[in-house]
């Protein structure tokens, strides 16, 4: 709970510094960057101070600062693929943006604003994925594969329900959300924004599946396969964007994200099933049935 309070404080401080540095100080983009860095630094100091004062079990002792080769190897084996995965995902976003840019400033503005709303309604999926990582890691670590599978099934059930709710909210609140970003008449932008949103919300279930399966595998210590899922996502988005630009179709451009989500979801689902089956075979080999 305390870390959430620090996060809320950091967000509020970020807004306050934005107003002070951009509006009051006239610093523009530099002020926005400085506000973000300062607010995150304050949050990090508060979290570190809380750990040091209130949770001594998490505070490294005098002999615990020396890195151990095995620990470093394990952390890098998971951390590097995760970093590459985020880089690949960001590259896919650049591909999508390049395709949208060809349709003019109205399309770009509408796509950007609708994308903000899309990101907002996706937050529940992201949170569920983070919870699945911890859940799967704990149960996979103690060899309870049945609980891992039950958790994944429950996570996918929640994902389907949430995806439907997010789709309804995304389409219902699109115009009010657009009004927050733009003053005056937004009628010219709405067709672009609504086309993008109406296509994306149909594929929220594959998007939610990505967060479930990717985080489960990462929680179980598998870093390469989630990264490979990011590559599948990038390739699907790239192929769709190329065809969209050649055909000059904004509708096809809006399918870049859904195509990427679907490709990644299928790849990650298949990878998860293979990992679970392999783990079950290894467990049966280690624990042969008792003889009667």
Identify the role of each PLM range.
Residues 11, 15, 19, 32, ...:
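Hydrophobic positions within alpha-helical transmembrane segments of bacterial inner-membrane proteins
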Residues 24-80, 136-203, 244-292:
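Short alpha-helical transmembrane segments in multi-pass integral membrane proteins
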């Amino acid at each position: 709970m305390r870390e959430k309070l620090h996060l809320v404080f950091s967000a509020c401080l970020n807004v306050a510094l934005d107003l002070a540095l951009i509006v009051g100080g006239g610093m523009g983009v530099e002020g926005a960057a400085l506000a973000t860095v300062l607010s995150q630094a304050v949050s990090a100091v508060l979290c570190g101070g809380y750990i040091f004062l209130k949770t001594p079990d998490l505070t490294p002792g005098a002999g615990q600062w020396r890195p151990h080769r095995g620990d470093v190897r394990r952390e890098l084996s998971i951390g590097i693929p995760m970093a590459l995965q985020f880089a690949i995902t960001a590259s896919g976003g650049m591909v999508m943006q390049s395709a949208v840019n060809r349709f003019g400033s109205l399309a770009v503005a509408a796509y950007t604003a609708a994308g903000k709303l899309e990101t907002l309604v996706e937050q529940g999926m992201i949170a569920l994925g983070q919870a699945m990582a911890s859940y799967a890691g704990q149960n996979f670590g103690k060899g309870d594969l049945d609980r891992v599978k039950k958790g994944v099934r429950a996570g996918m059930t929640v994902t389907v329900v949430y995806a439907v709710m997010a789709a309804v909210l995304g389409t219902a609140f699109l115009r009010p959300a657009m009004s927050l970003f733009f003053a005056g008449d937004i009628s010219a932008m709405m067709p672009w924004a609504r086309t993008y949103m109406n296509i994306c919300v149909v594929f929220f279930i594959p998007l939610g599946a990505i967060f479930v399966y990717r985080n489960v595998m990462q929680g179980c210590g598998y870093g390469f396969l989630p990264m490979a899922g990011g590559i599948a996502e990038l390739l699907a988005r790239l192929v769709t964007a190329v065809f969209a630009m050649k055909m000059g179709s904004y509708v096809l451009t809006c399918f870049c994200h859904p195509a990427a989500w679907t490709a990644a979801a299928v790849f990650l689902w298949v990878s998860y099933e293979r990992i679970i089956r392999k783990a079950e075979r290894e467990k049966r080999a280690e624990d042969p049935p008792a003889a009667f």
